[in-house]
């Protein structure tokens, strides 16, 4: 089958036969293994459908992708979130079962294009399977694995099994290019998400009333999207609230994590939990304590001063090994994009109640640290560029 490109031609026995994209019903097989991938995948599907009304989709993902595609996921990302060596080992049978499902569906569906969204541990192995068993399919990767931070050895697999890579951070173009692999920066989808939300009508008074919040300033608590990291990070965040009686501490619950799970960690404290409203919460927050991940960048795009935290197993040993495992001096996207420390990172044994309170005190009230952070946020926003990441990526994938 010819790629979906307007004006493509095929030469057969002296005749030139034109082929046009609207004559070809394209099939897209997409894998997104996390909540963030579900969001980006849903927008990518919507943009592809705008360009290709007859497109067919089969995917591993979540509810948002299901809404965009009009079909249910083969496997929901909730059943694919395994963090850490021990957790992977305990669920190895389930992981192999999911991998077999992906392989079987690929060969049953026979897609024209395979789109992999982040989730490199699973996706790079799947890319290898695709190239060995369905070489006619184009393998596109949206949101490059963070090889500049760790596991650079994966670049070998990318060069071999991934046809095109679309990145969401400007510096990745140079990083990959200097290692002999050309990638395309399409913009950052978080810029799209936050910009779209900020352009919507929003009633802060109504938001507070609907969620049982009074007029006191709010500290947002973003503890991550996976149960394991939430369980590790949230207890200290909850304890922190007892030191700030003039503020409301509010947890932004992750999609796909049950209310009972959060309630078991919060107990009888005065910390509130809201569901499906992370962006509204950040829009009204005075400050935030954020588990390292995409949420740190989203918090910066909302111009909310933050303390970044991350609890890892191993404590001091983990921090001693960090330079050997992670090639960047920082873990938060805010600092990595800025190329300097903009937000304080409290990692492993440094993430304590006392140290978190010390850092939060510096940004919760107006002062030099808070203003400096907000200024740095503006610089980061300029570097990331304009909205339209998902649309640009979809256009490139569609045209082939």
Label each region the model flagged.
Residues 3, 23-400:
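Nucleotide-activated sugar donor-binding and catalytic core shared by glycosyltransferases
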């Amino acid at each position: 089958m010819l790629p979906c490109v307007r004006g493509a031609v095929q030469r057969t026995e002296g005749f030139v036969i034109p082929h046009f994209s609207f004559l070809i019903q394209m099939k897209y097989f997409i894998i997104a293994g996390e909540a963030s991938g579900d969001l980006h995948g849903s927008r990518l599907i919507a943009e592809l459908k705008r360009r290709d009304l007859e497109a067919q989709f089969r995917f591993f993902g979540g509810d948002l992708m299901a809404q965009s595609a009009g079909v249910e996921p083969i496997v929901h990302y909730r059943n694919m979130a395994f963090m850490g060596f021990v957790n992977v080992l305990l669920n190895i049978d389930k992981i192999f079962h999911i991998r077999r499902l992906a392989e079987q569906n690929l060969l049953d569906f026979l897609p024209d294009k395979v789109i992999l969204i982040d989730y490199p541990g699973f996706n790079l192995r799947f890319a290898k399977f695709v190239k060995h068993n369905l070489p006619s399919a184009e393998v596109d990767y949206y949101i490059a694995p963070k090889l500049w931070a760790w596991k650079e050895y994966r670049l070998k697999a990318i060069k071999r099994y991934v046809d095109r890579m679309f990145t969401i951070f400007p510096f990745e173009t140079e990083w990959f290019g200097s290692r002999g692999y050309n990638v395309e920066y399409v913009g950052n989808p978080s810029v799209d998400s936050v910009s779209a939300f900020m352009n919507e009508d929003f009633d802060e008074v109504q938001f507070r009333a609907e969620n049982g919040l009074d007029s006191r300033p709010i500290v947002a608590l973003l503890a991550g999207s996976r149960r394991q990291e939430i369980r590790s990070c949230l207890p200290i965040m909850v304890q922190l609230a007892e030191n700030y009686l003039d503020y409301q501490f509010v947890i932004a619950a992750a999609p796909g994590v049950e209310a009972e799970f959060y309630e078991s960690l919060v107990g009888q404290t005065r910390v509130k939990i809201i569901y499906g409203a992370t962006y509204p919460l950040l829009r009204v927050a005075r400050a935030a304590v954020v588990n390292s991940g995409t949420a740190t960048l989203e918090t910066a795009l909302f111009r909310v001063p933050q303390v970044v935290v991350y609890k890892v197993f191993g404590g001091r040993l983990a921090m001693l090994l960090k330079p050997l495992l992670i090639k960047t001096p920082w873990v938060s996207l805010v600092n990595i994009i800025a190329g300097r420390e903009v937000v304080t990172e409290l990692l492993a044994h440094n993430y304590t109640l006392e140290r978190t309170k010390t850092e939060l005190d510096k940004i919760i009230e107006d002062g030099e640290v808070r203003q400096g952070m907000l200024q740095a946020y503006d610089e980061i926003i300029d570097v990331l560029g304009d909205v339209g990441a998902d649309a640009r990526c979809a256009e490139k994938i569609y045209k082939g």
